[in-house]
């Protein structure tokens, strides 16, 4: 397993996450770990004019106390797709190349995804293509405990300096 790493699913993960995607030819994306709120699984942090801004994708509550990541459903509560897209536009519309990427990026906020894992994986694959990276992203077939692998899960943003959306 020296040529691959296991990463957790993440919504527009921090740059450290992508350095692992760059460093390994094969990356397993853990989809059988237990979902935890307030992690990068459904939260990203962007640089806004007023400082770091946390954007959170709402999820549906599961009847099961320990829902696996692949089964977490996205909720349409709060019109989050519209709110997130407007936050990206407000933060980056004057950035170089925003117009070049905006149409393709916007499709992630127009399309309804049922599962958070699917949304995160497709978005990660798109980001990788934009920066000329082609890692092999492979969803895990069963839970892989951290002790069995060189596992790196960037799971939780720091609550400091964050505003909620």
Describe each region flagged by the PLM:
Residues 1-36:
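Short, extreme N-terminal leader segments that mark the start of a protein/domain
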């Amino acid at each position: 397993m020296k040529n691959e790493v296991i990463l957790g699913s993440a919504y527009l993960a921090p740059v450290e996450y992508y350095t692992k995607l760059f460093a390994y030819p094969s990356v397993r994306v853990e989809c059988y770990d237990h979902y935890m709120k307030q992690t990068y699984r459904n939260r990203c942090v962007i640089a806004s004019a007023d400082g770091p801004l946390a954007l959170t994708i709402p999820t549906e509550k599961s009847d099961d106390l320990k829902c696996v990541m692949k089964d977490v459903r996205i909720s349409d509560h709060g019109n989050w797709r519209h709110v997130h897209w407007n936050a990206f536009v407000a933060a980056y519309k004057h950035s170089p190349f925003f117009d070049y990427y905006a149409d393709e990026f916007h499709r992630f906020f127009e399309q309804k995804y049922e599962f958070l894992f699917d949304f995160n994986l497709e978005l990660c694959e798109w980001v990788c293509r934009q920066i000329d990276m082609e890692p092999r992203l492979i969803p895990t077939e069963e839970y892989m405990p951290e002790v069995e692998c060189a596992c790196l899960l960037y799971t939780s943003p720091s609550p400091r300096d964050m505003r909620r959306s």
